[in-house]
Amino acid sequence: MGIAGFGGLGHMALKYAVAMGAQVSVFARNDKKKQMAQKLGAANFYTSVEECKEKFDLIISSIPTQYDLLAYTKLLKYGGEVAIVGIPPKDPQRNLDFGDLVLFSGNHKVYGSWIGGVKETQEMMDFSVKHGIYPEIELVTGQEIDATWDKLLNGQGNFRYVIDMKKSMENFKK
């Protein structure tokens, strides 16, 4: 299977897929997170989709921006699926774009998901505990929020940020 996008959602998708026994390839914009992807169990890491035509049964896209969905459907084997879990922007000028012919000629499926219900969430929490799956985080203080936001907007984010309230309050009192 493939995972497109290796940020907050993508790195968790990799951890879950590896724990379920999948051989996973990660697609990202550049090599900055290659070492981390390999450490978390990625079998392959690509910065281009060109070398992977008709290779995957499933691709999970966690990309939260506009991108060429057609490029990823071309990576699917016959009957393959793309699950979109990254929420694209609401800009009507920037919708996801893909060709109908690719879907029909390969009997592909494209679907999306935001979140499961209470039952599914509990199952994932139980699975996470059983397999030691937790997000990679970076603690930041309240004073670092603006700089952290800028990093996220510029594609320099590291998975998940958590505000350290204790340290923030200590800094505030100084």
Each language-model region and where it sits:
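Mid-domain Rossmann-like dinucleotide-binding core that forms the NAD(H)/NADP(H) cofactor-binding site
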Residues: M1-V49
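N-terminal Rossmann-fold cofactor-binding loop
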Residues: F27-N30, S62, W114
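Helix N-cap at the beta1-alpha1 junction of Rossmann-like dinucleotide-binding domains, i.e.
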Residues: N30-K32, Q66, P89-K90
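A short acidic, Gly/Pro-enriched loop at the edge of an enzyme's catalytic core
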Residues: E51-I59
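Helix-to-beta-strand junctions that scaffold the AdoMet/dcAdoMet cofactor pocket
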Residues: L76-Y78
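Short glycine-centered segments of the SAM/dcSAM-binding site in methyltransferase folds
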Residues: G80-E81, K109
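Rossmann-fold NAD(P)-binding glycine/threonine-rich loop
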Residues: I87-G106, V118-D126
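C-terminal hydrophobic helical "lid"/dimerization subdomain
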Residues: V118-K174
